């Protein structure tokens, strides 16, 4: 990996963009020049990279032929406009929005699960990063899928407000402060109060009664595993936590498996930190926030189903759920395919 690359981070002023830049630095990604980009509203500010302040440039004025790799995290509309332009200019786009995820000719990649899919990046010079809730679930389920097969996934998510952006973080903090002082609140980011509450809606409702967030987990699981026979039944819930998503997962395996069998395949799996004791378990706040692993605990046999396994999975949605996964894709790209 002696070659260095000119790298774009589009959405550099946002939470995911800033974290991508931090992770690029932490992991010593071989960068010749970093181009932080944003809309004209955010251009002119700076980001810190390798001990220097780097100016955020206006995407409208950028010459894409200067870049070899681009990380996009500025929203689907921005990716729709700029990703094809960047890709046609020779920049490989790693897109963190949902815009390209369901296109058949765009690989949807979790490096611990299906790194071989990156080989298809030249179809359009675009690689899609999956949804945060899908990433942590499939990192945890891949070893189980390989060892025993999976026929059905029931999952309930408990997703932090950072998944909705900086405004949602501020809204939760502000509501908590006001309510503790006995002051009224006015929800803006969410349709209902989020402080001291849980909301069984993430994204818009679809005709089948599921939300778009829930259906993302269905579509993405089948595409990433390359298995349309897996049945996925999700309920996605927003909870008053700042960072880190949690998931209660109830599996039905094709081959029967005991809890100890499942722990054995999870123990040394890449990207996973396993909590084996019943008395110890990971949480979003105490383990996942600000860290990279996918944490798995409460692995147990389902007492209601002979092929059932239950587990609890938590991960930082901004890091592994978005920024880290994007950088890991780029690492595999330059190591094996560039």
Swiss-Prot record:
<dbReference type="InterPro" id="IPR036291">
    <property type="entry name" value="NAD(P)-bd_dom_sf"/>
</dbReference>
<dbReference type="InterPro" id="IPR012280">
    <property type="entry name" value="Semialdhyde_DH_dimer_dom"/>
</dbReference>
<dbReference type="InterPro" id="IPR000534">
    <property type="entry name" value="Semialdehyde_DH_NAD-bd"/>
</dbReference>
<feature type="binding site">
    <location>
        <position position="317"/>
    </location>
    <ligand>
        <name>NADP(+)</name>
    </ligand>
</feature>
<keyword id="KW-0457">Lysine biosynthesis</keyword>
<keyword id="KW-0486">Methionine biosynthesis</keyword>
<keyword id="KW-0791">Threonine biosynthesis</keyword>
<dbReference type="GO" id="GO:0051287">
    <property type="term" value="F:NAD binding"/>
</dbReference>
<keyword id="KW-0028">Amino-acid biosynthesis</keyword>
<comment type="similarity">
    <text>Belongs to the aspartate-semialdehyde dehydrogenase family.</text>
</comment>
<dbReference type="InterPro" id="IPR012080">
    <property type="entry name" value="Asp_semialdehyde_DH"/>
</dbReference>
<protein>
    <recommendedName>
        <fullName>Aspartate-semialdehyde dehydrogenase</fullName>
        <ecNumber>1.2.1.11</ecNumber>
    </recommendedName>
</protein>
<dbReference type="GO" id="GO:0004073">
    <property type="term" value="F:aspartate-semialdehyde dehydrogenase activity"/>
</dbReference>
<dbReference type="Pfam" id="PF01118">
    <property type="entry name" value="Semialdhyde_dh"/>
</dbReference>
<dbReference type="GO" id="GO:0009089">
    <property type="term" value="P:lysine biosynthetic process via diaminopimelate"/>
</dbReference>
<dbReference type="Pfam" id="PF02774">
    <property type="entry name" value="Semialdhyde_dhC"/>
</dbReference>
<feature type="binding site">
    <location>
        <position position="159"/>
    </location>
    <ligand>
        <name>substrate</name>
    </ligand>
</feature>
<comment type="pathway">
    <text>Amino-acid biosynthesis; L-lysine biosynthesis via DAP pathway; (S)-tetrahydrodipicolinate from L-aspartate: step 2/4.</text>
</comment>
<feature type="binding site">
    <location>
        <begin position="13"/>
        <end position="16"/>
    </location>
    <ligand>
        <name>NADP(+)</name>
    </ligand>
</feature>
<dbReference type="GO" id="GO:0071266">
    <property type="term" value="P:'de novo' L-methionine biosynthetic process"/>
</dbReference>
<comment type="subunit">
    <text>Homodimer.</text>
</comment>
<feature type="binding site">
    <location>
        <begin position="41"/>
        <end position="42"/>
    </location>
    <ligand>
        <name>NADP(+)</name>
    </ligand>
</feature>
<keyword id="KW-0560">Oxidoreductase</keyword>
<dbReference type="GO" id="GO:0019877">
    <property type="term" value="P:diaminopimelate biosynthetic process"/>
</dbReference>
<feature type="binding site">
    <location>
        <position position="101"/>
    </location>
    <ligand>
        <name>phosphate</name>
    </ligand>
</feature>
<dbReference type="InterPro" id="IPR005986">
    <property type="entry name" value="Asp_semialdehyde_DH_beta"/>
</dbReference>
<feature type="binding site">
    <location>
        <position position="187"/>
    </location>
    <ligand>
        <name>NADP(+)</name>
    </ligand>
</feature>
<feature type="binding site">
    <location>
        <position position="238"/>
    </location>
    <ligand>
        <name>substrate</name>
    </ligand>
</feature>
<keyword id="KW-0521">NADP</keyword>
<dbReference type="GO" id="GO:0009097">
    <property type="term" value="P:isoleucine biosynthetic process"/>
</dbReference>
<feature type="binding site">
    <location>
        <begin position="162"/>
        <end position="163"/>
    </location>
    <ligand>
        <name>NADP(+)</name>
    </ligand>
</feature>
<dbReference type="GO" id="GO:0046983">
    <property type="term" value="F:protein dimerization activity"/>
</dbReference>
<feature type="active site" description="Acyl-thioester intermediate">
    <location>
        <position position="132"/>
    </location>
</feature>
<comment type="pathway">
    <text>Amino-acid biosynthesis; L-methionine biosynthesis via de novo pathway; L-homoserine from L-aspartate: step 2/3.</text>
</comment>
<dbReference type="GO" id="GO:0050661">
    <property type="term" value="F:NADP binding"/>
</dbReference>
<comment type="function">
    <text>Catalyzes the NADPH-dependent formation of L-aspartate-semialdehyde (L-ASA) by the reductive dephosphorylation of L-aspartyl-4-phosphate.</text>
</comment>
<dbReference type="GO" id="GO:0009088">
    <property type="term" value="P:threonine biosynthetic process"/>
</dbReference>
<feature type="binding site">
    <location>
        <position position="216"/>
    </location>
    <ligand>
        <name>phosphate</name>
    </ligand>
</feature>
<feature type="active site" description="Proton acceptor">
    <location>
        <position position="245"/>
    </location>
</feature>
<keyword id="KW-0220">Diaminopimelate biosynthesis</keyword>
